[in-house]
Amino acid sequence: LLRAATADDSRAIHRLVISGGINPTGLDWRRFVVAISAQGEVIGCGQVKPHRDGSLELASIAVTPEWRGQGVARAIIERLLAENPGALYLMCRSGLGGLYEKFGFRVIQEDEMPRYFHKISRLAGLVEMLRRDG
């Protein structure tokens, strides 16, 4: 089951993001979609995060280890893309770009990045920057 997150999900979202090794800044539960197990546990999450320069970032995609490989992340990504049909950006660890290319993202160069991502990419190090046109 996928649904919009509620305030009650905020702790579970934070735990998932931290356990996934994802930067926890900007975690506002109101932007999240969560995947819920049959037992009512939050087993996955993701958000589309707006930035001051107007760009939107697909971010914080995380799934509990025991649910990985079962389509949870795919379902979350598909839902977020359907709800946000315009241009989206994302940063991911090098080597994960292929996963997102399946959803229409493509690797971009520095000169194609919005200002926020251009600045943060220098700090992030080994990441790939991708864009999906709406």
Feature-to-residue mapping (PLM):
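Short amphipathic alpha-helix that is part of the acyltransferase structural core
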Residues: 1-24, 34-37, 41
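Short, small/polar residue-rich loop motifs at catalytic or cofactor-binding pockets
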Residues: 28-29
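Conserved beta-strand in the GNAT
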Residues: 34, 41-51, 55-62
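Hydrophobic, well-ordered beta-alpha structural blocks that scaffold small-molecule cofactor pockets
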Residues: 45-47, 74-79, 99
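Conserved acetyl-CoA-binding loop-helix of GNAT-fold acetyltransferases
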Residues: 63, 69-82
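Conserved GNAT acetyl-CoA-binding A-motif
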Residues: 82-95
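Conserved active-site alpha-helix within GNAT-family acetyltransferase domains
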Residues: 94-121, 128
